[in-house]
């Protein structure tokens, strides 16, 4: 029996469907451990985002600047007909590197369930990471290659007063 044999393909498809069903049931009941996170690069550092807090990942669209806003607020982007505020987290966090540019840069939006039409620029998206396989070290997680990742809670960021205040205050 070869791998191109119809019976073999049906067996592989059945196995795949069973595994997918198990994963979907675990996600629905919460019995599965959520350890997959999205790896992104911001300001030359690597961060891990909870997949439930991350929305779309798109190439950086044209931005419309908004006057009298904080320097880290880059403006508005139209994502599939919805206006999304775009933030430079590197500037917001006071990092040296400026806004992410170049072919690898992406706009990562907050999940719609967060109720905040916002996104941030990532210099690079590193894909899914398995946090359970990493070693905690001084508030960060270190992977098998020795790369340190900082957890980034978008929910906590969305609740931050400074993050919510994109307009310049009088006298600034």
For the regions a language model picked out, list residue spans one by one.
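An acidic, low-aromatic, low-complexity terminal/linker signal
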Residues: 1-172
């Amino acid at each position: 029996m070869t791998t191109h044999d119809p019976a073999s393909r049906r067996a592989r498809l059945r196995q795949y469907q069973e595994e997918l069903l198990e994963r979907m049931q675990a996600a629905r009941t919460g019995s599965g451990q959520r350890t997959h996170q999205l790896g992104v690069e911001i300001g030359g550092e690597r961060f891990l985002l909870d997949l439930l807090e991350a929305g779309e990942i798109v190439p950086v669209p044209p931005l419309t600047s908004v006057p009298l806003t904080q320097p880290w607020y880059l403006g508005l982007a139209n994502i599939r007909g919805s206006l999304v505020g775009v933030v430079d987290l590197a500037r917001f966090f006071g990092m040296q590197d400026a806004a992410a540019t170049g072919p690898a840069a992406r706009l990562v939006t907050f999940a719609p369930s967060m109720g905040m039409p916002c996104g941030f620029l990532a210099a690079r998206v590193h894909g899914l990471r398995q946090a359970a396989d990493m070693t905690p070290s001084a508030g960060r997680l270190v992977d098998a290659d020795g790369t340190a990742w900082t957890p980034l809670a978008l929910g906590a960021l969305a609740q931050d007063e400074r993050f919510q205040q994109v307009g310049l205050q009088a006298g600034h």
